[in-house]
C-alpha cells in the first residue's frame, strides 16, 4: 500500500480501507495524509520505538523515512524550536484505538531530543510521571479497551528559547464520573480503586478501614476485579513513586488515598425505606458502622452526615424547609456525593500536578500542546456524555478543515501559486445546531433546566422537536422533514443529529439530571465541615458564609465554555494530527475488521481529509530533495548538476512528456497536481534505476575482473619473490650455520689446548716434566763440576746417574772430546800443523 493516502488511486472509501489493511498486515501501522498520521493499534509491541529510532527520525525530514509518530513529533518540535511557532498535536480516535499510547510516544520523543541538564531532566521526569498518575485516577477497563481514558486531556508543554522544557499545564475535560457508582457488565471502575486494594499493605488498609477483597464494595464490579496483563499492585507502587517525583508530599499522598477510600465506603452505606409519623415515605441508614467509620476517618459528624443523606434543606425567601428524602432520592444523593467527591479529587490532582510543573512568570516561552480526547462515539445507547463528546469532535473537525485549508492557502500564497477554491462540507451548521447561544440544543437544555414548573426530559425533547422540526440535520419521531414515523430504530424519547461522521440517535433520558449535575447543599456543607484538610478544600461552596445563591453553571455550559477556550487555543497554534484507529473489537493482534475500520474512518473524516488535501496539488516538495530524487531522469542533471535547484528541476521535468497543467513552480517548491503524475515519475525513476543498475553491474564486473587479475598478478610476483628470497635465505642460513659450527669447534679446540695444562688430567705430565727437568738440571750441574782434564789423550768421562741420560751423556762426551781436539789444534802453529798433516799422510 501507499504510505501517503494523498497518492491513493483510485480514491474512494473501499480503496482507502484496503490500503490500510495491506499496510496493517505488513505491520506498517502508520500512514500519512499529508502531514496527518493515521495510527492503527497493533495490540502488540513492535520493534519500531526506542533511542535508535528516535535518533533516526531526528536526523531526517518528514517524508524521508517510513511514516511514524516520531516523524510528526520531530516536525512539531523542530518547528517550535527553529521557527518559533507554537504547536499543538491533536490525537483523536475511539476508545481502544491507542490515543494514550500515542500521546506517550510524543512526550517520550520530545523528552529524548530536547536539552539535557539536571533541571531539565527533573522537569522532563515530572511531565512523564504525570501520565501514570492521571491514568490511575482517570482510566478504566471498558468492554472495548482495558486501559480506556475516561476523560479528555490537553497538556501545554512549555519550552525556553533553546528548546528545553520548562514545565507545563494540564487541562482535563469531562471526566466520566458516572462510572464511579455504576459500570456496565464486563467493565471496571477507575484503576486506582483496584490498585489501592491490591497494592496497599496491611497497615495502610487498616488505616483506611478497607478490606483487600474488591467484591466487598458496591461501587466495584467484583466479577472483573483483575485484568489480564495488568498488575494492580505493581501499578499502585508506580503511582505512589510518580506522585513523589511530581512533588506530592507523603501527607498529600495519604490524604488522596483517604478520599479515594471514602468514595468506596460511601458506596457501602446502605439506605432503607422508612415511613414518617404522617405516613410519608422517608429513608435511613441501615448500618451505622459504615457512617461511623467515615466520620472517624474524615473528621465528620456521623449524625450530620446521615441527616444530609436522608433529607434536604430548601430555602424559600427567608425560610428554610427541610424535606425528607425517600430511599430512591437518598440513594441518588449518596451517589451524587460520591461522584462529586471523586470528580473534585481528580480536578484537585490535576491542579496539584500543574502547581509542580508550572512555569514561572516573566519567562519567554514556546508552547507545544498535546490533546488526547475522546473520538466520535456511536453506541447502542447514546446519552448526554456521547452528545457532548460528539459536539467536541464536530468542533475539532471544524478546526481541522479550516486550519488545513488555511495552511494550504498560506502555502500557495508563500509560493506564489494561484489559490483555487476548495469545495468541502462545512459542518458549521451542525455546530450551530448544538452550541448556538440562543437557539442551540445546549441553550435549550439550560433553559429547560432553569425554568420553573414541571421539568422533564420529555418536555425538553418536545421543545427541540418544535424548534428544529425543519432543520436538515435534526430528526426525531415526530418531525416530518425525514418522515421518521416508521423508523423502529428511534424511540419516542430519542432525537437524531446528522453529524459529519454519520447519524447518531440520542436518548434524552437523564439529559436534565446530567446537565444539572446538582449536589444538595446539605451534603456540600457537611463535607466542608470535615476536619480532613483535603476533603474540606474540595467543597469551598459548602461554606455557609461564602455560599452564593447563584446557581452554578450546568455541565453542558461548562463543557461548551471549555471547548470554546480549547478551540481558541488550537487556532493560535500550528496543528499536527494523529488519527487513531482500532482494527478490531477483540483487541487481537493481526486481525483487521474492515467494517469496523470503515466506520471509524467515517467518524474521523479521513476521506474528506484526503479530498481537501488533494483539492489543489496533491504533492509538493522543496526543489533540492526533489532534484536529488529525480535528477537521474535527465542527462542534463545526471550524474552532476552544479546549477540552481529550480533550474535543475525544470530540466528534469522538461525532459519528460508532462502536461503543463500538472505542474506548478513555486518559489521554493515544485507542486504536482495529480498522483498519477507522481506515479509516472516514480515509474520512470524505477526504469532508469534498472538501466543504471545494469550499467553499474557491467562496470563493476569489468572492474572486478581487472582488479582480480591485478591481484592475481601481484600475488604471483609476490609469491615468486618470496620463494626465491626464502630459498636464498635458507642457503645463507645453512652456510652461516656451518661457519659458526666450524668457528665454534676451532675456538673450542684452541681453548681446550690453552687450558689443558690447568686440567687435572695434565697434572701427571706436568709433574713428570718438572721431575725430569730437576734431575736433568742436577745431572748437568754435577757434570759441570766433574769435567775431566782437557788433555786430548785423556778419555775418562763420568758415568750417567740414570739410564735415561745415557744417550745424552755419550753425546756430551763426544762433543767435549771434539771441543778438546779443536782447542788443541787451535794451539798449534802452522808449521806444527803441517808436520802433523804429513805424518798422517805417511
Curated annotation (Swiss-Prot):
Residue span(s) of domain Myosin motor: 1-686
Residues that hold ATP according to the record: 93-100
Domain of life: Eukaryota
GO molecular function: actin filament binding; ATP binding; calmodulin binding; microfilament motor activity
CDD domains, sorted: MYSc_Myo1
Similarity section: Belongs to the TRAFAC class myosin-kinesin ATPase superfamily. Myosin family.
Function: Involved in directing the movement of organelles along actin filaments.
Name the record gives this protein: Unconventional myosin-Ia
Amino acid at each position: 500500500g501507499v504510505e501517503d493516502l494523498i497518492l491513493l488511486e483510485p480514491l474512494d472509501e473501499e480503496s482507502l480501507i484496503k490500503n490500510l489493511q495491506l499496510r496493517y498486515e505488513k505491520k506498517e501501522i502508520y500512514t500519512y495524509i499529508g502531514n496527518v498520521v493515521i495510527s492503527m493499534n497493533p495490540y502488540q509491541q513492535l520493534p519500531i520505538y526506542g533511542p535508535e529510532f528516535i535518533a533516526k527520525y531526528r536526523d531526517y525530514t518528514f517524508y524521508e523515512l517510513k511514516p511514524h509518530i516520531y516523524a510528526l513529533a520531530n516536525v512539531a518540535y523542530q518547528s517550535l524550536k527553529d521557527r518559533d511557532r507554537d504547536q499543538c498535536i491533536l490525537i483523536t480516535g475511539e476508545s481502544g484505538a491507542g490515543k494514550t499510547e500515542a500521546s506517550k510516544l510524543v512526550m517520550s520523543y520530545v523528552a529524548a531530543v530536547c536539552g539535557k541538564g539536571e533541571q531539565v531532566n527533573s522537569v522532563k521526569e515530572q511531565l512523564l510521571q504525570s501520565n501514570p498518575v492521571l491514568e490511575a485516577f482517570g482510566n478504566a477497563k471498558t468492554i472495548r479497551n482495558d486501559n480506556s481514558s475516561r476523560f479528555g486531556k490537553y497538556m501545554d508543554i512549555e519550552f525556553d528559547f533553546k528548546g528545553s522544557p520548562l514545565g507545563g499545564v494540564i487541562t482535563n475535560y469531562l471526566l466520566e464520573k458516572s462510572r464511579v457508582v455504576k459500570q456496565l457488565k464486563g467493565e471496571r471502575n477507575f484503576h486506582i480503586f483496584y490498585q489501592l486494594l491490591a497494592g496497599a499493605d496491611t497497615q495502610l488498609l487498616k488505616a483506611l478501614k478497607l478490606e483487600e477483597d474488591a467484591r466487598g464494595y458496591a461501587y466495584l464490579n467484583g466479577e472483573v476485579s483483575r485484568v489480564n496483563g495488568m498488575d494492580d499492585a505493581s501499578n499502585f507502587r508506580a503511582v505512589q513513586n510518580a506522585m513523589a517525583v511530581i512533588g506530592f508530599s507523603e501527607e498529600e499522598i495519604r490524604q488522596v488515598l483517604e478520599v479515594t477510600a471514602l468514595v468506596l465506603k460511601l458506596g457501602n452505606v446502605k439506605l432503607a425505606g422508612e415511613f414518617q409519623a404522617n405516613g410519608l415515605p422517608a429513608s435511613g441508614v441501615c448500618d451505622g458502622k459504615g457512617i461511623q467509620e467515615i466520620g472517624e476517618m474524615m473528621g465528620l459528624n456521623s449524625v450530620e452526615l446521615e441527616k444530609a443523606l436522608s433529607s434536604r434543606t430548601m430555602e424559600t425567601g427567608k425560610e428554610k424547609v427541610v424535606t425528607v428524602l425517600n430511599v430512591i432520592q437518598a440513594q441518588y444523593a449518596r451517589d451524587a456525593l460520591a461522584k462529586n467527591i471523586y470528580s473534585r479529587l481528580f480536578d484537585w490532582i490535576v491542579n496539584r500536578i500543574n502547581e509542580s510543573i508550572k512555569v514561572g512568570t516573566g519567562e519567554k516561552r514556546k508552547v507545544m500542546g498535546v490533546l488526547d480526547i475522546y473520538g466520535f462515539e456511536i453506541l447502542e445507547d447514546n446519552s448526554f456524555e456521547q452528545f457532548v463528546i460528539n459536539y467536541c469532535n464536530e468542533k475539532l473537525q471544524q478546526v481541522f478543515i479550516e486550519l488545513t485549508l488555511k495552511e494550504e492557502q498560506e502555502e500557495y500564497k508563500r509560493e506564489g501559486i494561484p489559490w483555487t477554491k476548495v469545495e468541502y462540507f462545512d459542518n458549521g451548521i451542525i455546530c450551530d445546531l448544538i452550541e448556538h447561544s440562543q437557539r442551540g440544543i445546549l441553550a435549550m437544555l439550560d433553559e429547560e433546566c432553569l425554568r420553573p414548573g414541571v421539568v422533564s426530559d420529555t418536555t425538553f425533547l418536545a421543545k427541540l422537536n418544535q424548534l428544529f422540526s425543519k432543520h436538515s440535520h435534526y430528526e426525531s419521531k415526530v418531525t416530518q422533514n425525514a418522515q421518521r414515523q416508521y423508523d423502529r430504530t428511534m424511540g419516542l424519547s430519542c432525537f437524531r443529529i446528522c453529524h459529519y461522521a454519520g447519524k447518531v440517535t440520542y436518548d434524552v433520558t437523564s439529559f436534565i439530571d446530567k446537565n444539572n449535575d446538582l449536589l444538595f447543599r446539605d451534603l456540600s456543607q457537611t463535607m466542608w465541615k470535615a476536619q480532613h484538610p483535603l476533603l474540606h478544600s474540595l467543597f469551598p461552596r459548602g461554606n455557609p458564609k461564602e455560599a452564593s445563591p447563584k446557581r452554578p453553571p450546568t455541565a453542558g455550559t461548562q463543557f461548551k465554555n471549555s471547548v470554546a477556550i480549547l478551540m481558541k487555543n488550537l487556532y493560535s497554534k500550528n496543528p499536527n494530527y494523529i488519527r487513531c484507529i482500532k482494527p478490531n473489537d477483540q483487541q487481537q493482534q493481526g486481525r483487521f475488521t474492515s467494517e469496523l475500520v470503515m466506520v471509524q474512518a467515517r467518524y474521523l473524516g479521513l476521506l474528506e481529509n484526503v479530498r481537501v488535501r488533494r483539492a489543489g496539488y496533491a504533492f509538493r516538495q522543496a526543489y533540492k530533495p526533489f532534484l536529488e530524487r529525480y535528477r537521474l531522469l535527465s542527462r542534463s542533471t545526471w550524474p552532476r548538476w552544479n546549477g540552481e535547484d529550480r533550474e535543475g528541476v525544470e530540466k528534469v521535468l522538461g525532459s519528460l512528456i508532462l502536461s503543463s497543467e500538472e505542474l506548478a513552480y513555486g518559489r521554493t517548491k515544485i507542486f504536482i497536481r495529480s498522483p498519477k503524475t507522481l506515479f509516472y515519475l516514480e515509474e520512470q525513476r524505477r526504469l532508469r534505476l534498472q538501466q543504471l543498475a545494469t550499467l553499474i553491474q557491467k562496470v563493476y564486473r569489468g572492474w572486478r575482473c581487472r582488479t582480480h587479475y591485478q591481484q592475481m598478478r601481484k600475488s604471483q610476483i609476490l609469491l615468486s619473490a618470496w620463494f626465491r628470497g626464502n630459498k636464498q635465505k635458507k642457503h645463507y642460513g645453512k652456510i652461516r650455520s656451518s661457519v659458526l659450527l666450524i668457528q665454534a669447534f676451532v675456538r673450542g679446540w684452541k681453548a681446550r689446548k690453552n687450558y689443558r695444562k690447568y686440567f687435572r688430567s695434565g697434572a701427571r705430565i706436568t709433574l713428570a716434566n718438572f721431575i725430569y727437568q730437576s734431575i736433568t738440571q742436577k745431572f748437568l750441574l754435577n757434570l759441570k763440576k766433574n769435567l775431566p782434564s782437557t788433555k786430548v789423550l785423556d778419555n775418562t768421562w763420568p758415568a750417567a746417574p740414570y739410564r735415561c741420560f745415557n744417550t745424552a751423556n755419550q753425546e756430551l762426551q763426544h762433543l767435549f772430546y771434539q771441543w778438546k781436539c779443536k782447542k788443541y789444534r787451535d794451539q798449534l802453529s802452522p808449521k806444527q800443523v803441517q808436520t802433523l798433516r804429513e805424518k798422517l799422510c805417511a
